[in-house]
């Protein structure tokens, strides 16, 4: 697995939290749950065809109300061990802001390898209106414009639609999503939403944020160009109706990475 692919693996794990965990509050004021969470990253399983034998790391996530929009902060670090005896130290940081009407988005993404920054993406994006297209303007690493097709959603708007579908027992959703996480930042996301999960008790974490209905959402990520038969990767997320994710599994075919919630705390909203 090349350097870029390794970092992209961690980026996709963190992206799932930004894509899901930021959106529940956007249209459901009674369930607003700005929060700070910590996750432990481990190797869930690997097939005999995989050269990955160990994964360990952490992922810190914060979602907050900024009055005019929603902010997401993430900091991730992961060590990947290979059957050759080599290992890679990977990191991924994200800071984003999305307007509450879902039409504007700003992002700053940094990829790290062995403690040094290997990539950086910065810019802003805007849609011409609900359901309409728009453009993303990158300022780092190079100045360029990415056209966004009609129907494109930003992460919070997408996650809101996911939870609306879950509440309404609508199991399928396909959308184009822009998040700025790489040089193109645009991808197709196919979602399959399970029926409501049974509410379990006696877990290691005790928080009112976890005492709410939840669903498992299976996400498949596709490149935006062409008609790819297979997704680049798949993810399985257990999410509560307040937007809190307590389990994330990233499936790369020959191995899976698990992100398990280890700490959760609510954040106070601002005095807008």
Briefly describe each language-model feature range.
Residues 2-14:
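Bacterial N-terminal signal peptides that target proteins for export
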Residues 12-22:
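Bacterial N-terminal signal peptides
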Residues 28-34, 62-71, 97-103, 207-211, ...:
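A short, structured loop/turn motif at beta-sheet edges
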Residues 108-272:
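Mature, soluble, non-transmembrane domains
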Residues 27-84:
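N-terminal cleavable signal peptides for secretion/export
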Residues 74-127:
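Hydrophobic/aromatic-rich structural module bridging two neighboring secondary-structure elements via a short loop
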């Amino acid at each position: 697995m090349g350097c870029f692919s390794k970092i992209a693996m961690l980026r996709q794990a963190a992206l799932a939290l930004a894509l899901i965990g930021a959106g529940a509050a956007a249209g459901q004021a009674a369930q607003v749950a700005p929060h700070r969470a910590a996750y432990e990253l481990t190797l869930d399983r690997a097939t005999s065809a995989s050269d990955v034998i160990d994964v360990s790391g952490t992922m810190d996530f914060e979602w907050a109300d900024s009055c005019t929009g929603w902010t997401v902060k993430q900091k991730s670090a992961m060590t990947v061990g290979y059957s050759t005896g080599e290992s890679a130290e990977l990191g991924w940081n994200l800071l984003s802001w999305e307007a509450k009407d879902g039409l504007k988005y700003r992002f700053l993404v940094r990829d790290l390898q062995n403690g040094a920054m290997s990539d950086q993406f910065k810019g802003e994006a805007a849609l011409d209106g609900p359901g309409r297209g728009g453009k993303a303007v990158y300022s780092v690493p190079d100045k360029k414009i990415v056209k966004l097709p009609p129907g494109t959603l930003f992460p919070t708007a997408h996650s809101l639609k996911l939870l609306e579908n879950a509440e309404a027992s609508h199991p399928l959703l396909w959308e184009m999503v822009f998040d700025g996480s790489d040089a193109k930042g645009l991808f197709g996301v196919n979602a399959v939403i399970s029926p409501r999960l049974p509410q379990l008790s006696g877990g290691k974490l005790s928080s009112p944020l976890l005492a709410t209905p939840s669903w498992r959402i299976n996400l498949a990520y596709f490149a935006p160009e062409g008609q790819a038969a297979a997704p680049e990767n798949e993810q399985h997320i257990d999410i509560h109706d307040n937007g809190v994710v307590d389990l994330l599994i990233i499936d790369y075919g020959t191995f899976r990475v698990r992100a398990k919630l280890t700490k959760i705390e609510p954040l106070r909203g601002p005095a807008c």
